[in-house]
Amino acid sequence: MVRVVATGTFDIIHPGHIRFLEEAKKLGDELIVIVAREKNVRHKPKPIIPEEQRVRVVSALKPVDKAILGDEHDIFKPIMELKPDIIALGYDQHFDEKKLEEELRKRGLNTRVVRIKAKEECEYCSSTKIIKRIVDVVKSRLQEYEEFFRSRGML
């Protein structure tokens, strides 16, 4: 059985995430997803959605056999425990495939690192674009939203 591991923040799930996970699943028999801990997200703003909720949503996705939270202190710890045959990286993930493979070999793992080049093309295939869209809509309709939330005792 070929075990594939994919990692990511998965803050606001969108079609790009789904495509990445579908492509990762095609690489093997079992797909385990490591969801980044909030404190370990450094290459972009902190996630909006709490980590426990992100892992729950990811675990419910069709291509995913299991989703777990990453380790707070050592990003390699869950990988060492899972011993994957393949690590799937998204087209835009900030890892160098060769350096990652070298690091895994130093740790005794013979894991292949595969860059998924497939990319879903859609207007909101980015959590950042979705957040920007929400901010823009809220700004343009601020009074309407304030009245809505006040009428429900939420402000």
Curated annotation (Swiss-Prot):
GO terms for biological process: FAD biosynthetic process; FMN metabolic process. One of its GO terms (molecular function) is ATP binding. Coiled coil: none annotated. Its cofactor is a divalent metal cation. Its EC number is 2.7.7.2. It is an enzyme of class 2 (transferase). Pathway: Cofactor biosynthesis; FAD biosynthesis; FAD from FMN: step 1/1. Pfam families: CTP_transf_like (PF01467). SUPFAM superfamilies: Nucleotidylyl transferase. The keyword Metal-binding does not apply. The keyword Flavoprotein applies. Signal peptide: none annotated. PANTHER family: FAD SYNTHASE. Homodimer. Belongs to the archaeal FAD synthase family. This is FAD synthase. It comes from Archaeoglobus profundus (strain DSM 5631 / JCM 9629 / NBRC 100127 / Av18).
